[in-house]
Amino acid sequence: IMLPVSLVWIVGVTNAMNLIDGLDGLSSGLGAIIAATLTIICWQAEQWVGVTIGLALFGALIGYLPFNFPPARIFLGDTGSLLIGFGLSVLALEGYRKAAFLAFIVPILALAIPLLATLLSIARRLRSGKGVF
């Protein structure tokens, strides 16, 4: 059962980060905050691969962020926002492997903003009669 749940998690978080990439600095700033949070979880769970991935993602986003504040000089595009979402979703799964309840709840709380934005977007489309996809 973990494989289908993990796949839904990865696809959901990846697309959630892509959907919130409409405003300058939102996806990259939120991604940096979430990456730092998940890196701390991986550190506490002694998941050193997750710590390495989290620090790399955090460093890349912090380095990119000043160029993406309004007026933005460069943009993530779909590829960048999808990469951030994929990295965060895998990082959350990596921290979940050893730590128990804390590692389960904190990634959900950290990723609540993009996930809720996605759910609201889907609900808005369904209510207006448009297709979800």
Q: Residue spans of the language-model regions?
A:
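PRPP/pyrophosphate-binding module of the type I phosphoribosyltransferase fold
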Residues: V11-N15, D24-S28
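Alpha-helical transmembrane segments
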Residues: L26-F133
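Membrane-helix boundary/helix-loop-helix interface segments in multi-pass membrane proteins
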Residues: I1-V11
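Helix-capping/transition residues at the boundaries of transmembrane alpha-helices
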Residues: M17-N18, L93
